[in-house]
């Protein structure tokens, strides 16, 4: 899958797993509808809602040169009751 980079496992995202919500970092150019389509197609689940926020890039310094990393988007995907993403269910326990 090109759009989704990886699943996020923070305290908040692990707490949201109990509410059937999964958190992913995605490429910043993708929209909510594109990610919803990809998740439904790839995992075979029904998505109820998609929330997103853009996280800023971090500053990096190499000697006198100041740069930054790319910003990225984090999506919180809510599934219909009865559906789950099997690869991420192990983190729930």
Curated annotation (Swiss-Prot):
Question: Mind naming one GO cellular-component term on file for this protein?
Answer: chloroplast
* Pfam families in alphabetical order: Ribosomal_L23
Q: What GO MF terms are annotated?
A: rRNA binding; structural constituent of ribosome
Coiled-coil residues:
none
Q: Which PROSITE patterns match?
A: RIBOSOMAL_L23 (PS00050)
A biological process term (GO) from this entry? translation
What UniProt keywords are attached to this protein's entry? Answer: Chloroplast, Plastid, Ribonucleoprotein, Ribosomal protein, RNA-binding, rRNA-binding
Keyword Cell division carried by entry = no
Q: Which domain of life is it from?
A: Eukaryota
Q: Where is the protein localized?
A: Plastid, Chloroplast
Q: How does it assemble?
A: Part of the 50S ribosomal subunit.
Task: List the PANTHER family hit by this protein, alphabetically.
Answer: 60S RIBOSOMAL PROTEIN L23A (PTHR11620)
Q: What does this protein do?
A: Binds to 23S rRNA.
Family designation: Belongs to the universal ribosomal protein uL23 family.
Q: What is this protein called?
A: Large ribosomal subunit protein uL23cy
Which organism is this entry from? Agrostis stolonifera (Creeping bentgrass)
Gene behind the chain: rpl23-B
